[in-house]
Amino acid sequence: RVLCDGRNYSDDHVALLRVQANDTHPRVRLDALRACSWVNTAAAAEVALEVVKHERDYYIDYALEEAIRGMEPLWKSAISSGKPFAANNPAGVEYILGSIPTADLANLPKSTPVLLAMLTRPAVKAQARQDALVGLAEFKKTDEMTELLSAIDYVDKTDAPGAATVIYDLVLMLTRREPGELAESRARFEAWTKSAKRAITRRIGYVALIAADESVDPAWKLATRSLDSLK
């Protein structure tokens, strides 16, 4: 509260608020959020997002939503400029991108968080999803298959509305990969059959195993060991 009231008299108030936004006590983090909304700069929006790294309650969620809404022109301008924003806070970037409509998201400068959001959101056109996959592999200097499998893992673990539909879309992309890529990813498919969160992902794991092995026998043998994995 002192930092908030004295924000016009301190040159390092944002840095000090960053410390408070990461405090172990939720009340301190809540007061830091309130102060950020009064500072009203892109840097303050970055600090407000620091609370996403920690456990949140109703009051922190409410304060965060209000603070981010009030500073929307500032953080949108920062993101649209292509300059680094909350670069060391992927959870915070994910939170803030969640408030941007898909149509607007497609117009933002390409970055790993933006491309991941395009790849894993519902109601994204097939070509836009494919373009996001290609871009993500380029940004991360990996390959499309690696990023596609990681995206399926990511969506499987979320509780976001439409996640099952997204998994279907991603699996459709998986069916277009080369047989050799499927064979090389066999261990990942088997892991899905055993430990995926969603039943649909576990079942897809079996289908992918059959495609990778070009035979139903190994998948059938694995399935009969545990009927629970088929549920």
Which residue ranges define each predicted feature?
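Long, ordered, helix-rich scaffold segments
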Residues: 1-231
